From Swiss-Prot:
GO cellular component, one term: cytosol
EC number: 1.4.4.2
Modified residues (N6-(pyridoxal phosphate)lysine): 708
Subunit relationships: The glycine cleavage system is composed of four proteins: P, T, L and H.
Family annotation (Gene3D superfamilies): Aspartate Aminotransferase, domain 1 (3.90.1150.10), Type I PLP-dependent aspartate aminotransferase-like (Major domain) (3.40.640.10)
Name under which the protein is recorded: Glycine dehydrogenase (decarboxylating)
Function field: The glycine cleavage system catalyzes the degradation of glycine. The P protein binds the alpha-amino group of glycine through its pyridoxal phosphate cofactor; CO(2) is released and the remaining methylamine moiety is then transferred to the lipoamide cofactor of the H protein.
Keyword Oxidoreductase: yes
């Protein structure tokens, strides 16, 4: 039959690229699970009363090429002015070797958080390097890797200061008046829910204030002044006040380490180590503290440990501090960090080394000195005598200066009274400085760079002698070897080879949605039109961003059934926090601020109680019944008991147990009946899109994990984006911003992120995904995700019982395999199975969540039947191995499972095991072999012998 032109054009071609199983494979799986079609399967599984009659109207699909052309036209509306705004954001030069081999490399950006250290040694090493950079530059003992942005790090520093403070009755936090305004904004938001009073004043007046538990100072103030706080910090320490210092990572190359001056906590943004501004993010924040406070630190800490053979190996240390274990008692609700961006920054430091970094920092400072000398020579006054890269220039005709700057396509900082701010960076050239002279002085200034350079080279007093660094930095060999591109390329490849990412195998982590991150989706993030914009540039210069964000928000509104979307939160946990704050402020607006009880099912993700606690709520746990569903009787009892104090419920749908609960609407009705709001966690949105929606179900607010459902890659543990969708009554209470008015938002609430649109530069990924899939493709993706999960469940059911099922024995988009009976019978645990899967070439499913002793599997729609069968065959082969242990063919203490994973060096060592080398490393005929580089980690050793900086290079070899 002859095809029509429309059929030949095939605008939906990407749908088939994104969805792994083709039509024939889908039919084979449907036959295996006993369903006639995708629609029939969905109809059996999803409760009838929440199924959408028609899919959301987000348009028809577009090809990869058409979508890229459309987005390129939108991006071209952004105006790329040269930015001197500063305020914590500068232009950068990302080394091409890092751009090509990391940022554009799926071996780096598709990996997951390194909870399985045996398959994560490469990025763990890069993160350990990031911690070493932080330790060397801050002068402190312990560093994490990493936090979401500088402002979030400031809020975490405040919370940590209160945790460790010996002044238990003090409830005031002092912030120096010259911190960045966005930092103060986020600190105030966090302080409100904790009940802290924030005092903002000149730093030298801090001692005038009583009952202060912590102080936040900024080493280089927001308008550029370098502060020597040595004496002040000493006085504050004598009064037992915890001192936090915000620092500029590039300035720290030249300036005294705040830790050496006595600071307890030092943090800042690592953005200017190679990460583009990207209209606000994503960027990694560094965070360091004194050793005595290490167990109170937020964020992930990479530690050096040993594997089962005694070899040096890396792991995430002290995880008992984190939300997935401590829940509401966690130090922070942070789940996502900024691993990909932290690794870019760490490799930037590796590539340039201490000599290269000093040259870059000195060049920036020299150009700033030259600019300052020329302006002063012509009679302009600088507000500060001591500076690194930022001048605050007093100008009589400010309007005229700004007009000339705009004509020259230059952005200066304009919010300073009777002055302009100018921040230089590593991209600044001689020509740029001459252009700045013309803007500030007129074209006939008569200044010459070389003449000015001679003057300042002999007489630069802009950094106080006491503030000049006198110690060596980055002395570890890793920072002093890889300076040629060949060496750097090979080093990065050696790290990449140690890790398991989606470019090698499926990553079946339940509750994580490790789906395809398509190349076409990733291409726009490095376009200069998106990468080079400052988040505080004038809005008329960001019309492309505004259009793209507005379109994406409109699509998300339609897909979620909500009325508005706020793009600011830059992680799922931050989205939870923002959504709960919206609920809190909504209640307060109705004079019901006493509503502070948050109901959370026992099965909830650890971020839920941690976020509720951070939002100033009390957590009350609701029981689950024997089928894993919310116990309605217990829910009613807890809601009635809370009464007028009920704030909300946090519920995940489909449930964390991998089932579409039949009573979800009734759950919403019960909570609404008692005046509460419904927060529907968007973690499992991949089983809703196009089929149902949170708004249609009856929820009031949700966060969306764009790094799960909408294809932003996990990056080895970040970046992420967690925008929140809200019903109209909550829209006035979503986060605002103190620097930038967010168009269309009437909100006056405080910010939760440093930038108004969070990690804006990765939003094009989700825009591309929705545009290329269209309504038809998005629904089909959800349906195939459900099909793939049910196919795995049905084929593994006899070997590994599925713990929870819904109607007709079906699961949603993930399933929980119960290992407890096997462990009781044979002694083989879920940990043993997880590690043995590595020998078969797979990342393990999620272990012991949400139920201890289980494995939760989520295949996503992107995996083909071939890959699903490979995983199933591996699991069945492992079950046969367990039977060998059960039959005493292999002893419990010496078998392929308890000894897994196996590494190459074992093949040439003495072999005393009761199974062959072939069984160990090529089980069941595994051909495309992934080789882990370490054996099973010794977690106890790692936490008892905490070591979180770089080890001798010989230990890596």
């Amino acid at each position: 039959m002859t095809q029509t032109l429309s059929q030949l054009e095939n605008s939906g071609a990407f749908i088939e690229r994104h969805i792994g199983p083709d039509a024939a494979q889908q039919q084979e799986m449907l036959n295996a699970v006993g369903a006639q079609s995708l629609n029939a399967l969905t109809g059996q599984i999803v409760p009838k009363d929440i199924q959408l009659a028609t899919p959301p109207q987000v348009g028809a699909p577009a090809t990869e090429y058409a979508a890229l052309a459309e987005l390129k036209a939108i991006a071209s509306r952004n105006k790329r002015f040269t930015s001197y705004i500063g305020m914590g954001y500068t232009a950068v030069q990302l080394p091409p070797v890092i751009l090509r081999n990391m940022l554009e490399n799926p071996g780096w950006y598709t990996a997951y958080t390194p909870y399985q250290p045996e398959v994560s040694q490469g990025r763990l090493e890069a993160l350990l390097n990031f911690q070493q950079v932080t330790l060397d530059l801050t002068g402190l003992d312990m560093a994490s890797a990493s936090l979401l942005d500088e402002a979030t790090a400031a809020a975490e520093a405040m919370a940590m200061a209160k945790r460790v403070s010996k002044l238990k009755n003090a409830n005031r936090f002092f912030v120096a008046s010259d911190v960045h305004p966005q930092t103060l904004d986020v600190v105030r938001t966090r302080a409100e829910t904790f009940g802290f009073e924030v005092i903002v004043d000149d730093a030298q007046k801090v001692l005038d204030h009583q009952d202060v538990f912590g102080v936040l100072l900024q080493q280089v103030g927001t308008t550029g002044e370098i502060h020597d706080y040595t004496a002040l910090i000493s006085e504050l320490k004598s009064r037992k006040i915890v001192v936090s210092v915000a620092a500029d990572i590039m300035a720290l190359v030249l300036l005294t380490a705040p830790g050496k001056q006595g600071a307890d906590i030092v943090f800042g943004s690592a953005q200017r180590f190679g990460v583009p501004m990207g209209y606000g993010g994503p960027h990694a924040a560094f965070f360091a503290a004194k050793d005595e406070y290490k167990r109170s630190m937020p964020g992930r800490i990479i530690g050096v440990s040993k594997d089962a053979a005694g070899n040096t190996a890396l792991r995430m240390a002290m995880q008992t501090r984190e939300q997935h274990i401590r829940r509401e008692k966690a130090n922070s609700n942070i789940c996502t960090s900024q691993v990909l961006l932290a690794n870019i920054a760490s490799l930037y430091a590796v590539y340039h080394g201490p000599v290269g970094l000093k040259r870059i920092a000195n060049r920036i400072h020299r150009l700033t000195d030259i600019l300052a000398a020329g302006l002063q020579q012509k009679g302009l006054k600088l507000r500060h005598a001591h500076y690194f890269d930022t001048l605050c220039v007093e100008v009589a005709d400010k309007a005229g200066v700004l007009t000339r700057a705009e004509a020259a396509e230059i952005n200066l900082r304009s919010d300073i009274l009777n002055a302009v701010g100018i921040t230089l960076d590593e991209t600044t050239t001689r020509e740029n400085v001459m252009q700045l002279f013309s803007v500030l002085l007129g074209d006939n200034h008569g200044l010459e760079i070389d003449t000015l350079d001679k003057d300042v080279a002999h007489d630069s007093r802009s950094i106080q002698p006491a503030m000049l660094r006198d110690d060596e930095i980055l002395t570890h060999p890793v920072f002093n070897r890889y300076h040629s591109e060949t060496e750097m390329m090979r080093y990065m490849h050696s790290l990449e080879r140690k890790d398991l990412a989606l470019n090698q195998a499926m990553i079946p982590l339940g509750s994580c949605t490790m789906k395809l991150n398509a190349a076409a989706e990733m291409i726009p993030i490095t376009w200069p039109e998106f990468a080079e914009l400052h988040p505080f540039c004038p809005p008329e210069q960001a019309e492309g961003y505004q259009q793209m964000i507005a379109q994406l928000a409109d699509w998300l509104v339609k897909l979620t059934g909500y009325d508005a979307v706020c793009m600011q939160p830059n992680s799922g946990a931050q989205g939870e926090y923002a959504g709960l704050l919206a609920i809190r402020h909504y209640h307060e607006s109705r004079n019901e601020g006493h509503r502070d009880i948050c109901l959370i099912p026992a099965s909830a993700h650890g971020t839920n109680p941690a976020s509720a606690h951070m939002a100033g709520m009390q957590v009350v746990v609701v029981a689950c019944d024997k089928n894993g569903n919310i116990d309605l009787t217990d829910l009613r009892a807890k809601a009635e008991q809370a009464g007028d104090n009920l704030s909300c419920i946090m519920v995940t749908y489909p449930s964390t147990h991998g089932v579409y609960e039949e009573t979800i609407r009734e759950v919403c009705e019960v909570v609404h009946q008692f005046g509460g709001q419904v927060y529907l966690d968007g973690a499992n949105m991949n089983a809703q899109v196009g089929i149902t929606s949170p708004g249609f179900i009856g929820a009031d607010v949700s966060h969306l994990n764009l790094h799960k459902t909408f294809c932003i890659p996990h990056g080895g543990g970040g970046p992420g984006m967690g925008p929140i969708g809200v019903k109209a009554h909550l829209a006035p209470f979503v986060p605002g911003h103190s620097v930038v008015q967010i168009e269309g938002m009437l909100t006056r609430q405080g910010a939760v992120s440093a930038a108004p649109f969070g990690s804006a530069s990765i939003l094009p990924i989700s825009w591309m995904y929705i545009r290329m899939m269209g309504a038809e493709g998005l629904k089909k993706a959800s349906q195939v995700a459900i099909l793939n999960a049910n196919y795995i469940a049905s084929r593994l059911q006899d070997a590994f019982p599925v713990l929870y099922t819904g109607r007709d024995g079906r699961v949603a988009h993930e399933c929980i395999l119960d290992i407890r009976p096997l462990k009781e019978e044979t002694g083989i645990s879920e940990l043993d199975i997880a590690k043995r899967l590595i020998d078969y070439g797979f990342h393990a499913p999620t272990m012991s969540f949400p139920v201890a002793g289980t494995l939760m599997v989520e295949p996503t729609e992107s995996e083909s039947k071939v890959e699903l069968d490979r995983f199933i065959d591996a699991m069945l082969a492992i079950r046969a191995e367990i039977d060998q242990v059960k039959a005493a063919v292999w002893p419990l203490e010496d078998n392929p499972l308890v000894n897994a994973p196996h590494i190459q060096s074992e093949l040439v060592a003495e072999w005393a095991h009761p199974y062959s080398r072939e069984v160990a490393v090529f089980p069941a005929g595994v051909a495309d072999k992934y080789w882990p580089t370490v054996k099973r980690l010794d977690d106890v050793y790692g936490d008892r012998n905490l070591f979180c900086s770089c080890v001798p290079i010989s230990e890596y070899q």
